Structures are given as structure tokens and as C-alpha cells.
Amino acid sequence: MYVVFEGIDCVGKSTQISLLKEIYKDAIFTLEPGGTELGKHLREILLNKTHPINKRAELLLFLADRAQHFEEILKINQNKLIISDRSFISGMAYAKDFENDLLFALNSFALENFFPQKIIFLKGDANLIQERLSQKELDSIEKRGIEYFLSVQDKLEKVLHFLKEKISIEILTLDAKESKEKLHQQIKEFLQ
């Protein structure tokens, strides 16, 4: 089973994934972008840009990472439990300048039509995002601010709705303000 955690920065995806690592010791844990050597380099380029990157070029860099990630991680482990911190879904939401049909077609190509079966979508409000962003050093994406994140979160919801029409997926939407223990319990039940 391929399980994906989605949500904007600061909603607790990494915390919940860490808790699952204690339970699912044989699972494959990965992340996008950055789950491969190529991905680590591309992530570094994209998060710490010193020169502006055109939106189309940025999209294609993420797609290159996704295709490599599929080949190195997802494809060879598709009969195991795979738990990923983000996926093509975030890619579609962050590439909000492009149409969903185009993004879906490009991602389908990069992933050879291998999609997650279950998605855990953690949602946060402006207060939660503000509080958590204030506690860390910000990368170039995080410096775009709360309004940017909330617009991406809105786009994530729209992408998830779009995908329900295209592929067979189960989605669990959770309020990131809940305690990490309560969220963990709900996630464990969803993965049963």
C-alpha cells in the first residue's frame, strides 16, 4: 500500500511520520522532493535559489525528481507499505499556475500511473501556521508567508477533489490543531 501525507509546511506531517516509524518498522519511508540523490540536489536548488527560476522550469525540475523517485523507490517497493512525506499532489498544488489536467498528465507520465491508495491530509489555520513558522528558520518557500501557504492549502483541497474524480483514492482530512496523540490514533485507524 502506498500512503501519502499531504499538507502545507508546519502542519505536523513529519511528526506523524516519525510516530509511524515506531510501528511500521518494515515500511519504506520516503519524501518528495528529496527522496533520491537527484532529488536532494534538486530540492537544494529549489529551496535555496540564488537566481530566479521560471515556473515552467521549476515544474519540470520537480517532475524530473518525481520520475527518478518512482524508479528508485516506488517502483521497486510497490508491494510493500510505502509512507511518503508529500507526493505529486503537493507538486500539483504548488504549480498553481498550470491547469490540473496538464499537471495530472505530466505526473501520470512521471509516475507510470502509480498513485497512492491512501492520503492523509493535515490542515492548518492561519494562527497555527504563524505560530509554527515563528519557531524556525525559513527557507525561500516559507518566506512567502502565511497567505501563500493558505492559498496552497486551498489548492491542495481542490487537487484532492479533482483526483477523486480521476483515480481510486481514500482521503483522511485532519485538523492539525488536534493533539499529536489524537491525530496519531486517527491515522493508525485509517491505515488498518
Curated annotation (Swiss-Prot):
Locate the residues binding ATP. G7, I8, D9, C10, V11, G12, K13, S14
Report keywords, A-Z. Answer: ATP-binding, Kinase, Nucleotide biosynthesis, Nucleotide-binding, Transferase
The GO cellular component terms are: cytosol
Q: Which reaction does it catalyse?
A: dTMP + ATP = dTDP + ADP
Q: Which GO terms describe its molecular function?
A: ATP binding; dTMP kinase activity
EC numbers listed for it are 2.7.4.9
What Gene Ontology biological process does one annotation of this record name?
dUDP biosynthetic process
Q: What SUPFAM superfamilies does the database record attribute to this sequence? A: P-loop containing nucleoside triphosphate hydrolases (SSF52540)
User: Which InterPro entries does the annotation name?
Assistant: P-loop_NTPase, Thymidylate_kin-like_dom, Thymidylate_kinase
What role does it play?
Phosphorylation of dTMP to form dTDP in both de novo and salvage pathways of dTTP synthesis.
Q: Which HAMAP family match?
A: Thymidylate_kinase
Q: Of which family is this protein a member?
A: Belongs to the thymidylate kinase family.
Under which name does UniProt file this protein?
Thymidylate kinase
